[in-house]
Amino acid sequence: MTLSLKLIGYPIEHSMSPWIHNEFLKRSNLEGTYELFEISPEESFEDNVTTLKKSVLTGFNVTVPYKQKIMQFLDEVDDTANLMGAVNTVSIRDGKWIGYNTDGIGYLRSLYAAYPFLKGVTNKRVLILGAGGAARGIFHALVNEGYNNIKIANRTLSRAESIIGTNKQALAISLEEAAEELHQFDLVIQTSAVGMNEPRSIIILDRINEDTVVSDIVYQPLETHFLQLAKQRTPYIHHGHTMLLYQAQAAFEIWTGTNVNVSGMDMQIEQILKGR
């Protein structure tokens, strides 16, 4: 069987996903293609979905700005994606479109690959910076993993509170409080767009401990200003391009049932991004 896979979103011309998934196909000895299907805001999203429904597809990824919009066109949505309110992976089985979200599991896999000593140690104190879709996915993945000491800091507090919901073991705080309390956290995860293609950090990092693990899910630039500041305080740095790799791995598993070996791919992605 030849797999037919796509990525829908806008803009996506510089996406790493085709390279990643075509590498997965090679490593798994599977035949198939992974192609971009760009839908600009000026186009009818519904018409494009109709076109996709008429084509022979194995599945597709969904990225911004369509991770919520796609949900109304799906036949089923798995519990995790429903909880997150967003879908980034669609599998097509017997004509049914089934939605998933691999953001959270992708983040955890990438974190544990970088720092195996964190796996199973769920009493760590965690700070999530930002309250968008990625923060929601990562928060629920951490909660499902058993983490019970999580704070979410955001400029608009109500957005952080909406992610936490009724979870009694999590707390929404301001960015100012987060900067003051930084020394209390074992893991700090930057999920906002601040620092994407600009030398800015969402908060001052002067109070980070030397054994704190610091993540930034932004991968353009490869090393954000946030991570550059963190490196002055701690050696435990976790780059965003690795989350991209592992959320893709989880999507590929959904489509193919194959647990693809990603060994060395993080370094290859790093080299490609450095060349841009």
Swiss-Prot record:
Signal peptide: none annotated. Shikimate binds at S15, M16, S17, T63, N88, D103, Y219. Belongs to the shikimate dehydrogenase family. Keywords: Amino-acid biosynthesis, Aromatic amino acid biosynthesis, NADP, Oxidoreductase. Pfam families: SDH_C, Shikimate_DH, Shikimate_dh_N. Involved in the biosynthesis of the chorismate, which leads to the biosynthesis of aromatic amino acids. Catalyzes the reversible NADPH linked reduction of 3-dehydroshikimate (DHSA) to yield shikimate (SA). InterPro entries: Aminoacid_DH-like_N_sf (IPR046346), NAD(P)-bd_dom_sf (IPR036291), SDH_C (IPR041121), Shikimate_DH (IPR011342), Shikimate_DH-bd_N (IPR013708), Shikimate_DH_fam (IPR022893), Shikm_DH/Glu-tRNA_Rdtase (IPR006151). It catalyses: shikimate + NADP(+) = 3-dehydroshikimate + NADPH + H(+). One of its GO terms (biological process) is aromatic amino acid family biosynthetic process. The active site is at K67 (proton acceptor). One of its GO terms (molecular function) is NADP binding. PANTHER family: BIFUNCTIONAL 3-DEHYDROQUINATE DEHYDRATASE_SHIKIMATE DEHYDROGENASE, CHLOROPLASTIC, SHIKIMATE DEHYDROGENASE. This is Shikimate dehydrogenase (NADP(+)). GO terms for cellular component: cytosol. Homodimer. Pathway: Metabolic intermediate biosynthesis; chorismate biosynthesis; chorismate from D-erythrose 4-phosphate and phosphoenolpyruvate: step 4/7.
